[in-house]
Amino acid sequence: IRPGTDSATGEPIDIITSYQLAGSDDEGMKRRIALEACPGFGSCGGMFTYNTMQTFIGVVGMQPLHMVSPASQDDRRLTEFPDQLIDCLDNMVAKDIKPRDIVTNESIRNAIIVAMAVGGSTNVMLHAPEIARAAGYTNFSADVMSAEEFNHLSTNVVPVIVDARPFGRFSMVDIDARGGIQVFVKDLLDAGLLNGDVLTCTGETLAEQLARLDPPAPDGDVIHSVAKPYKPCLLYTSPSPRDCK
């Protein structure tokens, strides 16, 4: 969903704006924001579960990277992407490329690392093991990534490089305007944090797909770089160290 505009102030607003006003006594303002915050259709525009997993599926190789960030109402979803997807399917059939050729332990690791880098939804750690299981990896910790490695990578190795809602300022349409998710995926690849040899649904490796897309460099405002990240790491703690008793 594209961000809305507050008709009274002209400021951009979204679903987070509505949440932040939930305790306000100004019922008129709450109603106005609720009606204007989410125009159109689609998923929540920030890096919530949907966009985290949409990015995950792109990086794991099951969707072309350039199709992830455009808004639901973007004309490309009707005028360009359908034919391109048919070409992908034709190529996969012709070359006998199956989902399990694409969704491997290495491509899932890539997608998890990107989820860290975008500060994505913690639900990724519910969905990723099930995706891995469907791909034939029954022991996620041993076959893909252990909890200890995840914590090490997110704390010491992989920074947050996107300033996105709900923790930041921008939405997926802003990421799209700066070149799409392929910008930060390439930056992570160039930094040596991803395996570029994994196969994708385009018939190319991840590195080959990124080379063809040739995304711009991170703009430093919406999309940051590994060298100059938005935040150095993900928060790792327990909000309830003594349990909720």
List each model region and its residues.
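Single conserved hydrophobic/aromatic residue that forms the stacking wall/gate
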Residues: Y236-K245
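Terminal amphipathic helices with adjacent charged low-complexity linkers/tails
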Residues: P64-L85, H127-S171, D176-D214
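Solvent-exposed alpha-helices and their adjacent loops that cap or buttress functional pockets
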Residues: E36-A37, F48-T49, V103-R109, A164-F167, ...
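Long hydrophobic segments that form regular secondary structure
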Residues: K98, G120-S121
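Active-site cavity-forming subdomains of large catalytic enzyme subunits
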Residues: I1-N110, V114-A115, A132-A135
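Active-site loops and adjacent core secondary-structure elements that bind or stabilize anionic groups
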Residues: S107-I113, P129, T202, P216-D219, ...
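Short glycine/serine/threonine-rich phosphate/pyrophosphate-binding segments
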Residues: Y50-N51, S121-A128
